[in-house]
């Protein structure tokens, strides 16, 4: 009788585990122009964890997209100056992956010119070039990929800027991370990316 009870309990536990939906880590950026959603890759755990930690601390909420170059990138976080990189809370070892490239909407970590190619924990960029930027591959770490909000990316990338590529009208940031199920991802129009997500996670 005890064996039967244990067997039933075991089957119940297995059944509950099977019914638990899988959630995925998603980055979220809110700006005055609109919202963007992007995957956070498991293949770059140091950068992913860093992004999640700073987002949960609301680190970027007082900062902005301070460097905007059409057909290149939009960049935000710590100021795009040597002092800005010096003020980064920490640096991150590179996590290059030959299968993750600088395509349109790729999200990467910025850095200054250092031989180890260490990333500045506070600064990130999003690729705007629809043809991709292959020269950045294996030089800058990508940790995410936009799947919703490309229209927002385009609008920010085409804003009027000054001689330092700073937007004339400040683009403030509110950065968070979300947990989403497949159903929630589909509701946001991410259907075409679900197969890739299953391969990644």
Model region roles, listed by residue range:
Residues 4-13:
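Sec-dependent N-terminal signal peptides
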Residues 16-201:
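Cyclophilin-like peptidyl-prolyl cis-trans isomerases
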């Amino acid at each position: 009788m005890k064996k039967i009870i244990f067997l039933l309990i075991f089957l119940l536990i297995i059944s509950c585990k099977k019914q638990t939906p899988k959630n995925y880590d998603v980055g979220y950026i809110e700006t005055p122009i609109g919202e963007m959603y992007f995957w956070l890759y498991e293949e770059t755990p140091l950068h992913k964890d860093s992004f999640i930690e700073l987002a949960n601390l609301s680190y970027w909420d007082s900062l902005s997209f301070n460097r905007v170059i059409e057909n290149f990138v939009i960049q935000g976080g710590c100021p795009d100056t040597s002092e800005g990189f010096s003020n980064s809370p920490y640096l991150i070892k590179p996590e290059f992956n030959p299968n993750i490239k600088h395509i349109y909407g790729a999200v990467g970590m910025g850095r200054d010119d250092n031989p180890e190619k260490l990333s500045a924990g506070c600064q990130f960029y999003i690729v705007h070039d629809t043809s991709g930027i292959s020269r950045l591959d294996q030089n800058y770490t990508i940790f995410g990929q936009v799947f919703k909000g490309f229209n927002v990316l385009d609008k920010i990338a085409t804003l009027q800027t000054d001689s330092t590529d700073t937007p004339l009208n400040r683009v403030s940031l509110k950065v968070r991370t979300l947990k989403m199920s497949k159903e929630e991802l589909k509701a946001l129009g991410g259907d075409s990316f679900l197969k890739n997500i299953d391969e990644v996670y």
